[in-house]
């Protein structure tokens, strides 16, 4: 019925988002950075 099916649209998404691949690779690390930041902050206030 429609010329472009869902499969065709989904197949094009990785190509469209290819420039963002380096950013996506770094995203899972961000929460770990917040965890490390908490320790650095507590060390700076001497864990009071």
From Swiss-Prot:
The keyword Transmembrane helix applies. It is a single-pass membrane protein. It comes from the Eukaryota. Its main location: plastid. The keyword Thylakoid applies. InterPro entries: PSII_PsbK, PSII_PsbK_sf. GO terms for biological process: photosynthesis. The chain crosses the membrane at residues 23-43. GO terms for cellular component: chloroplast thylakoid membrane; photosystem II reaction center. Residues 1-11 form a propeptide. One of the components of the core complex of photosystem II (PSII). PSII is a light-driven water:plastoquinone oxidoreductase that uses light energy to abstract electrons from H(2)O, generating O(2) and a proton gradient subsequently used for ATP formation. It consists of a core antenna complex that captures photons, and an electron transfer chain that converts photonic excitation into a charge separation. PSII is composed of 1 copy each of membrane proteins PsbA, PsbB, PsbC, PsbD, PsbE, PsbF, PsbH, PsbI, PsbJ, PsbK, PsbL, PsbM, PsbT, PsbY, PsbZ, Psb30/Ycf12, at least 3 peripheral proteins of the oxygen-evolving complex and a large number of cofactors. It forms dimeric complexes. This is Photosystem II reaction center protein K. It comes from Euglena sanguinea. The lineage of its organism: Eukaryota, Discoba, Euglenozoa, Euglenida, Spirocuta. The gene is psbK.
